[in-house]
Amino acid sequence: IATVDCSDYPKPVCSLEYMPLCGSDSKTYSNKCNFCNAVADSNGTLTLSHFGKC
């Protein structure tokens, strides 16, 4: 199972780095920061489906 450590998030600003991750909501997030901010917003209900685009 793919995991991402989001303990340092949420962050106010994310970089434009492009390293896509696919969330359990079938949405592609452009990088770890954007994904982890979404995880924080979801109160932990969002998880990582896999690395790369959905």
From Swiss-Prot:
| Designated name of the protein | Ovomucoid
The organism encoding this protein is Phalacrocorax sulcirostris (Little black cormorant)
Pfam annotation, one family: Kazal_1
Transmembrane helix listed as a keyword: no
**Matching InterPro entries:** Bifunctional_prot_inhibitor, Kazal_dom, Kazal_dom_sf, Prot_inh_Kazal-m
Domain Kazal-like, residue spans: 4-54
- The residues that the database entry marks as glycosylated are 43
What would be one Gene Ontology cellular-component term for the protein? extracellular region
Q: Which GO terms describe its molecular function?
A: serine-type endopeptidase inhibitor activity
Question: What does the entry note on its domains?
Answer: Avian ovomucoid consists of three homologous, tandem Kazal family inhibitory domains.
Matching PROSITE patterns: KAZAL_1, KAZAL_2
Q: List the disulfide bonds.
A: 6-36, 14-33, 22-54
Name the site position(s) for Reactive bond 3.
Answer: 16-17
- Entry annotated with the keyword Glycoprotein: yes
Q: Which UniProt keywords apply?
A: Disulfide bond, Glycoprotein, Protease inhibitor, Repeat, Secreted, Serine protease inhibitor
